[in-house]
């Protein structure tokens, strides 16, 4: 992916629910209030928490401590638009990212973490699924979630579908569940355990998760992560 380039993708399917209509009679109201609503299913039900490993990608000419800190269970990662890429001579945008080393081709895989996006982070990807081995001419990513400096902090799929507003300066949980197959698989995105997006992936590939800041904008970008987990089934 070239510098200052973000792949676009079509709109996804947003989760929704049917409206519930109740009778206004006292008997019907009593019956309705007597039965509690069933709790929403946890997206990790039926999944197994699995260990994972990762390596770091950061500006090639800097120490990791110049762009990352870890304290109290929280990873802080930041980068500047003027920083060097992760490899000398590389043409991609600057980043400070965890590159997960649990590559996969098929099967069900879920990335899970609490995310905090400080105000002002604009144009940075904070989590993505990178297609490292893929058919020629196919996209480099299956999905990317980006932060933009609008609406109190807007999270978009690439630079298109709006998934969340008022995302700045607050913790929220993100889960990306990928049902990968030898053909076209399915990706589901959850915020605070509510489904916000369902889309197809980009077809067969070997891929891996990444999280941090991959900066396509200007100035400084930062993201924080805690309770990072990997699930399979």
List PLM regions with ranges.
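Ligand-recognition surfaces built from glycine- and aromatic
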Residues: 42, 108, 201-233
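Short strand-turn-strand beta-turns centered on an Asx-Gly dipeptide
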Residues: 190-194
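Extracellular glycan-recognition surfaces and repeat-rich motifs
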Residues: 53-79
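Secretory/extracellular carbohydrate-interaction modules
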Residues: 76-150
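Short tryptophan-centered beta-strand motifs in secreted/extracellular beta-sheet-rich domains
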Residues: 170-180, 187-189
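N-terminal module-boundary/linker segments of secreted carbohydrate-active enzymes
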Residues: 35-61
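Short, aromatic/His-centered strand-loop micro-motif at the edge of beta-sheets
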Residues: 154-173
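N-terminal export signals
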Residues: 7-26
């Amino acid at each position: 992916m070239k510098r200052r380039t973000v792949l676009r993708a079509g709109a996804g399917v947003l989760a929704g629910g049917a409206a519930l209509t109740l009778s206004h009679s006292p008997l019907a109201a009593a019956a309705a209030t007597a039965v509690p609503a069933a709790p929403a299913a946890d997206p990790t039900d039926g999944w197994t928490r699995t260990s994972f490993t990762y390596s770091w990608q950061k500006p090639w000419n800097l120490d990791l401590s110049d762009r990352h800190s870890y304290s109290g269970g929280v990873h802080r990662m930041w980068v500047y638009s003027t920083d060097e890429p992760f490899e000398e001579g590389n043409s991609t945008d600057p980043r400070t990212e965890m590159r997960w080393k649990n590559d996969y081709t098929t099967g069900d895989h879920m990335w899970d973490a609490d995310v905090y996006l400080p105000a002002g982070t604009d144009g940075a990807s904070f989590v993505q699924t990178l297609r490292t081995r893929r058919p020629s001419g196919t996209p480099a990513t299956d999905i990317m979630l980006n932060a933009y400096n609008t609406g109190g902090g807007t999270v978009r799929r690439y630079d298109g579908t709006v998934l969340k507003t008022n995302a700045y300066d607050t913790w929220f949980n993100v889960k990306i569940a990928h049902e990968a197959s030898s053909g076209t698989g399915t990706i589901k995105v959850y915020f605070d355990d509510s489904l916000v997006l369902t889309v197809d992936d980009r077809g067969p590939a070997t891929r891996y998760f990444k999280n941090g800041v991959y900066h396509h904008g200007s100035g400084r970008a930062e993201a924080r992560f805690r309770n990072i987990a990997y699930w399979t089934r």
